[in-house]
Swiss-Prot record:
Function: May have a structural role to stabilize the lipid body during desiccation of the seed by preventing coalescence of the oil. Probably interacts with both lipid and phospholipid moieties of lipid bodies. May also provide recognition signals for specific lipase anchorage in lipolysis during seedling growth.
Region spans: Hydrophobic: 39-110
Family stated for the protein in its record: Belongs to the oleosin family.
Protein name: Oleosin
Annotated Low complexity bias: 158-167
One annotated GO biological process: reproductive structure development
The keyword Transmembrane is assigned to this record: yes
Taxonomic source organism: Helianthus annuus (Common sunflower)
Region called Polar, residue ranges: 1-38
Compartment(s) of residence: Lipid droplet; Membrane
Bilayer topology: Multi-pass membrane protein
PROSITE patterns: OLEOSINS
Transmembrane residue ranges: 38-58, 69-89, 90-110
Disordered: annotated segments: 1-28, 155-181
Length: 181
């Protein structure tokens, strides 16, 4: 019989089949084998490159030791020439950098405008429709107001009221309607 401890211990442990364990062992073995082969292959390459770097460094030091007297002798000619060439190269590099920066900026702006060009007509159509609706609304309100003024004028004309002219021509000073001085 199994105890509570045995049941708990056996149910909480992961269940592996024998095939899963052997597959895991094979993967681990193949990974370590591939790492070993990579180290064996790259060790000579790294050693050769390190040796070439050392030879290049030693050659540079020997060349500098041999060329130093020539630099001292020809320094009145070499220094201005090196400065001139250095400044020219710096100018060309700066010019190229500014040109590439300008081209990339223009390219960015062109792409941004091209992407927004699809949404601009929709926005323009919306604004155009809104302005047209506002114009129609203002026209209708103007027409209604004109009709209201016309009907009010007819009503006043029918009743014989003359006070309208006094209100238009008069003011706070108490001028008469016909007096324009």
């Amino acid at each position: 019989t199994t105890t509570t401890y045995d049941r708990h211990f056996t149910t909480t442990q992961p269940h592996y089949r024998q095939d899963d364990r052997s597959r895991y062992d094979q993967q681990t073995h193949s990974q370590s084998t591939s790492r070993t082969l990579a180290i064996i292959a790259l060790l000579p390459v790294g050693g050769i490159l390190l040796g070439l770097a050392a030879l290049t460094f030693i050659g540079t030091l020997i060349g500098l030791a041999l060329a130093t007297p020539l630099f001292v002798i020809f320094s009145p000619i070499i220094v201005p020439a090196v400065l001139t060439i250095g400044l020219a190269v710096t100018g060309f590099l700066a010019s190229g950098t500014f040109g590439l920066t300008g081209l990339s900026s223009l390219s960015y702006l062109f792409n941004m405008v091209r992407q927004t060009a699809g949404s601009v007509p929709e926005s323009l159509d919306y604004v155009k429709g809104t302005l047209q609706d506002a114009g129609e609304y203002a026209g209708q309100k103007t027409k209604d107001f004109g009709q209201k003024i016309q009907s009010t004028a007819h009503e006043m004309g029918d009743q014989g009221q003359v006070g309208v002219h006094a209100q238009v021509g008069g003011g706070k000073e108490g001028r008469k309607s016909g007096d324009r001085t």
